[in-house]
Amino acid sequence: MVQSYEDMLKAAYSGIGEPTETGERFVMPKAKIYIEGKTTVLENFSDIVDSLNRDKDHFMKFILGELGTAGKIDGNRAVFNGKFEQAQFDAILETYVGDYVICSECGRPDTKLVKDDRVLMLLCEACGSKRPIRKRKAKTEVQGPAIEEGKELEVHIESISKKGDGVARIGKYILYVAGTKAGQNVKVRITRISGQVAFTQKIL
């Protein structure tokens, strides 16, 4: 049975912490960031890449696309132009793991990226399943309603954060909605905006 994208995300996040083939548990790496002048530094970039077992250039390109900025790899860290929030990196990391690391069939991280007739696929070395990588639009191409504090709007919950809040996206903004589930459409009120992160209150 073909799973919906929401079901795939649920399988990805429920699979985090499950034993790998070696018997070790996969632990979602935590981004360690700090502001340095007009830039944001991801201090443990190399550690995250090693933990995910992915190519550093592929991971870096993904982050740059999600943040809509420029940056560079500097030794074991990565530097991004602009000031960004911890919540943004947490959401980006969760999205990357769901799309490019966790098997949607067995929920394990024992996977690798392969090309099959020019199509990028995620091949699971644990259960043997293979699926195409979901194409994502660059954030600069995504348009949405204007975001401002106090505004009410309807959003689609794409995934669930590590803290249990629903994650939605409107244009360049990441919205957190407490008390929701992946796949839901809910009406919310914007309570606070910090950079490209918006905090909301669900309207009952």
From Swiss-Prot:
SUPFAM superfamilies with a match to the protein in the record: Nucleic acid-binding proteins, Translation initiation factor 2 beta, aIF2beta, N-terminal domain, Zinc-binding domain of translation initiation factor 2 beta
GO molecular function: translation initiation factor activity
Boundaries of every TRAM domain copy: 146-204
UniProt xrefs under InterPro entries: IF2/IF5, NA-bd_OB-fold, TIF2_bsu_arc, TRAM_dom, Transl_init_fac_IF2/IF5_dom, Transl_init_fac_IF2/IF5_N, Transl_init_fac_IF2/IF5_Zn-bd
SMART domains linked to this entry: eIF2B_5
Keywords: Initiation factor, Protein biosynthesis
HAMAP family, alphabetized: eIF_2_beta
Protein function: eIF-2 functions in the early steps of protein synthesis by forming a ternary complex with GTP and initiator tRNA.
Subunit organization: Heterotrimer composed of an alpha, a beta and a gamma chain.
Sequence similarity: Belongs to the eIF-2-beta/eIF-5 family.
Protein name per the record: Translation initiation factor 2 subunit beta
The organism of origin for this protein: Methanocorpusculum labreanum (strain ATCC 43576 / DSM 4855 / Z)
